[in-house]
């Protein structure tokens, strides 16, 4: 986002200092939190961060994407991210009927058992 487009948001952040912003605004605004995607960033250490990852390789539902991350990889990510003080935003994609695909359910249940 250009600095001009980011300015109204920046002004709101100044007017409401309790407002939380992330690093995606652009325009030179760093935000309160880092939000790396599909990677666990070591450069986020020392500030609040939330790692955004998918359970396979696609954001949302994609019937052709069957490249599921293993339960072990997802648990490792969860452990790694939270041990560094971060949040783990794991994207799962229900289909058009609102049904979570069984491979996702299996992995989420494995994570729940681990917790």
Where are the regions that the model predicts?
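Mature catalytic domains of secreted/periplasmic carbohydrate-active enzymes
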Residues: 1-115
């Amino acid at each position: 986002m250009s600095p001009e487009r980011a300015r109204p948001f920046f002004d709101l952040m100044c007017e409401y200092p309790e407002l939380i912003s992330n690093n995606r605004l652009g325009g030179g605004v760093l935000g309160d939190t880092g939000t790396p995607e599909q990677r666990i960033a070591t450069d986020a250490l020392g500030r609040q961060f939330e790692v955004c990852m998918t359970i396979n390789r696609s954001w949302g539902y994609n019937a052709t994407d069957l490249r599921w991350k293993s339960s072990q990889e997802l648990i490792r990510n969860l452990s790694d991210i939270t041990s560094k003080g971060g949040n783990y935003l794991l994207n799962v994609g229900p289909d058009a009927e609102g049904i979570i695909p069984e491979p996702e359910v299996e992995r989420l249940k494995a994570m729940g058992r681990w917790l």
